[in-house]
Amino acid sequence: MSTVQDYPSRLSRPESRKMGTFSYLPPMGEAEIRRQVEWIVKNGWNPGIEHTEPDFAAQIYWYMWKLPMFGETDVDAILAELKACHEANPGHHVRLIGYDNFTQSQGANMIVYRGTAV
């Protein structure tokens, strides 16, 4: 029987919280983020961008950056919007969501830029 490793994530320590599909993996570089955006587009999902303060990241509500990018297939345009959101909200977490029209749910959800915890 294998042992279960305790992950030291605590609500009292915002920098330790894990959120999103890839949060337990090492941070992704630009090339890996690009591949994930390409995958979202290839699946026909609609990208959406949200952001919030790190202290409130565990709550349900995040601020939506503009409207979801319905039908957007240009990966560079999606990456540019992610960067614009990060530049406008430098201390916030910025996440990319892939909305799946068929299942009417989120098909992907990942933090692209991590904010600084207070």
From Swiss-Prot:
GO biological process, one term: reductive pentose-phosphate cycle
MF annotations from Gene Ontology: ribulose-bisphosphate carboxylase activity
Keyword Transcription: no
SMART domains: RuBisCO_small
InterPro entries registered for this protein in UniProt: RuBisCO_ssu (IPR024681), RuBisCO_ssu_dom (IPR000894), RuBisCO_ssu_sf (IPR036385)
Keywords: Calvin cycle, Carbon dioxide fixation, Photosynthesis
Pfam families with a match to the protein in the record: RuBisCO_small
Its job: RuBisCO catalyzes two reactions: the carboxylation of D-ribulose 1,5-bisphosphate, the primary event in carbon dioxide fixation, as well as the oxidative fragmentation of the pentose substrate. Both reactions occur simultaneously and in competition at the same active site. Although the small subunit is not catalytic it is essential for maximal activity.
Family (UniProt): Belongs to the RuBisCO small chain family.
Complex formation: Heterohexadecamer of 8 large and 8 small subunits.
Note: The basic functional RuBisCO is composed of a large chain homodimer in a 'head-to-tail' conformation. In form I RuBisCO this homodimer is arranged in a barrel-like tetramer with the small subunits forming a tetrameric 'cap' on each end of the 'barrel'.
Name of the protein: Ribulose bisphosphate carboxylase small subunit
Record gene name: cbbS
